[in-house]
Amino acid sequence: MRKTINSNKLQFDTVRFCTSSDNISLIEGKEHLFKHTLDMETGELSIIEFNSQANQNNRALVPFSLYIHANRQSKRMTIEFSSKLLLEDYPLLISEDTFLQALRNIERLGICKLNVEAIIEDCSFNKLHATKDVDMELTESILDTLNLCTGDYRRYNWKRYMGESICFKKDVKTKDCQEELNIYNKEVEILTGKNKPFLKMVSNPTEIMAHYEKKTRFELKMGTKRMIMKKLKISDTSYYNVMRGNPNILLEQFDCIFTPSANSNAADTSLINGFTDYTLFCTLCFHKFNLKTIEQDIKDRRLYGPNSRCALGRAMNKVKSMAHAWNKQSTNANSIIEEIREKLESKSMNLQG
C-alpha cells in the first residue's frame, strides 16, 4: 500500500500537551502500569503517572518515549510521546492526519483509555519538535558547509555528534528565546541500538528501514508555549492552531541560521596571497574552522585590549572572509545551501508500506 506524506502540513516527531484529567480512564487489570500517589490528608488518589522509561516492564511494553501524568485534584493531565507511537506508520510523523491514531494506539497497547475527541477540543501544546525528512545524503562536505555558513557565529553554537549529525543552538539563557535545530542522518540513527526494541515490536521493520535510506532529518525543538506561538505564527497553542500553523517553519529557521557565502568575490582570487593569508588559513585549520572558538582563543590570549573591540572585529572579519573563500572554493557552498532550501520547500513525498 502506498501512502502519501503531505509535506505542506506540519509534522512533529515529539509532542507534549496539557488536557483535562477527566479524559483518562484506567484499564481493568492494567492499573499496575501506573504509579499511584495518594493525598496525605484525605487518603484519596491524587496523581497517576505512566513513564515508559520507569522500569524494565514498561520499557518492554513501550520501547519508546511515552509519558502520562494526570492530577485528579487540579484536573490537569500532561501527555508526551514520540511519533513511534504511530507504530507501523512511524514514518508518517505526527500531524493533523495522524494525531488521533497516535492517541488510539495508547489503548491499542493496553495502557489506558483516552477520550480522544475531548482531548482534541481542550488540549494545549507546550513542547513540539517540528520535523521533516528529506531525500539527501548528509555527507562530510555538507556538514562542513553548514559549519561555515552560519550567518552569525556569535549567535549560534554548533556541535557535531554521532559522526554524521550537527546541532545548532541559539546562545541565550532565556528559555523562551532558546532555539535548537538538529540535522542528522536518519538512515544511520534508525539503526542505532536504542531503536532496535522498537523495530522488533512493529510488523514492518524492513519497510521502515528502507524508507529512511539516504534520508536526512531536520528537527526544530520548541520547549515553551511562547516559542511555539512565535515560530508557528499563532495566537494560542490549541490543537487546530498548532496543526494548521506556519508550514514553512523549518525553512524559515534554516534561513535564520544559514546564509550563502557572504564574500563571494573572495573566491575569485587565489586563496593565499601572502604570509598574512597563510597565517589566517593555518589558524582556521588549527581550530577546525570554528569561528567562535577562534574568537574566544584570541580573547583568552589578550591579543587585543578591553577597549579594542573594533580591532578584534576587523580581525575576525578577515578570518571569516578567508573561511568563506575556502568554503566556496572547496564545497560550492551556495549551491548546497540552495539545494537544502529547495528540499525543505518540497510539498509531498510517497511512502511505500
Where are these regions (language model features)?
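Short, solvent-exposed alpha-helical "recognition" segments
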Residues: 317-332
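Helix-turn-helix DNA-binding segment
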Residues: 306-316
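Structured, helix-rich domain cores that form ligand/interaction pockets
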Residues: 1-300, 328-353
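Residue-level recognition of well-ordered secondary-structure positions
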Residues: 80, 221, 313-314, 320
